[in-house]
Amino acid sequence: YMIHIADKVGAGEGLMGVILAVSAFTELPAMALFPRMHRRLSLRTLFRVCAATFVLKDLLFWVARSPVLLYVAAVIQFFEFGIFLPACVYYVAERLDSANQAKGQGLIHVCSNGLGPAVMTAIGGRLIDSAGINTMLMVTTAAGFAGFLVVLAATSRYLDKGDQGK
């Protein structure tokens, strides 16, 4: 839906391409730095940062009236998927025995990169067609906030192995 978001701020295809490129580019350093981040921060904290950033990015897309906020939203992808993807790998490696790690990775990625996005893409498309891009972005922000609350609840008792709540 990035083309609709770019159109909303008066830009077009060129901005859409740049925003997507910046988003993808910022994930790489986050992934490379993840082992160092994880030495300092628990997976609980890292998952919470990711969840908060998902909400912030959706909110920035929703309230954006100029390309500047879209660039900011693209840069914070560092804290979103750039941390989320390696955090999932570490979580599975720490929590499952080696015989079940491939299944664990598969399940996480089917939910986070397959089934969930497929369902939400269909809903988002319907919302854009029936109510417009701003309504879709409002719903996305609300859904992201609900997801953030789920992450907070799910991680409230979680401690990394050997971690005393860092």
Predicted regions: what they are:
Residues 83-97:
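Intracellular juxtamembrane helix-capping segments at the cytosolic ends
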Residues 60-73:
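Helix-loop junctions at membrane interfaces in 12-TM secondary transporters
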Residues 1-16:
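Short amphipathic helix-loop junctions that connect adjacent transmembrane helices
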Residues 126-146:
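A membrane-interface helix-boundary motif in multi-pass transporters
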Residues 29-43, 128-129:
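Helix-to-loop junctions at the C-terminal end of transmembrane segments
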Residues 141-166:
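Multi-pass alpha-helical transporter architecture, strongest
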Residues 45-60:
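Structural signature of the two symmetry-related core transmembrane helices
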Residues 13-14, 96-109:
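Loop-to-transmembrane helix entry/capping segments in MFS-fold secondary transporters
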